[in-house]
Amino acid sequence: MRTQGVEVESLRAVDHAIATGVWPDMTEHGWERDDWPAISDRVLGADILVICTPIWLGEKSSVCTQVIERLYGNSHLLNDAGQYAYYGRVGGCLVTGNEDGVKHCAMNILYSLQHLGYVIPPQADAGWIGEVGPGPSYLDPGSGGPENEFTNRNTTFMTWNLLHLARMLKDAGGIPAHGNQRSQWDAGCRFDFPNPDYRSPSSAGAPAELPVWVRERGPRGPLRSDSPANRGPHVRSPT
């Protein structure tokens, strides 16, 4: 990434006093010290987040779990468009260890990131595992990790896909702000979600009629020009 002019910052979680909990600042909930608020500011200032973890007993480490929990503790924050604060950012993960579990760890980490609002590009995970049992770690001399063709290929593809998608989102101004704004939903807007109060046919025992654009689209046909997907952005007034 640095060779492409990207500013890269590495942060080792165990070097910081990150309190356990799911509030933005755990000093407000009994902890004497919590470095997370400052770390969170750095995370929110980045367009790309790559979470790295070793494998322990086939799972991501407890430290990695703690970091994800603290990320989740900030998931209530909104951006200027009323979307969740992590929108418009991309995420990936790197996993190392001496036992199987790279894909299992990546599955959990990438799911967690997308649930928070991150966009996950194709092949956004890479990893390396040594021989089964005790042995050298990735950076230890003679591990073979830095020379592994499979690991290097996946790391390269992940890097470029993160860069491509981050650039696409940056150029587009992030994820379009329609149908995904928590602030608007809380204000009563429903973005064309059917209001049960108007489903009078179903109350009489007949199935509710589908909107015209759904009925005429067909299972795989193109959207009609008057479908919501083809209209310009709009927000309904609260009713």
Could you describe each region identified by the protein language model?
Residues 20-24, 106, 134-136:
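Short aromatic-enriched loop/helix-cap "lid" or pocket-rim segments at secondary-structure transitions
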Residues 96-99, 139-143:
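Phosphate-binding/catalytic loops
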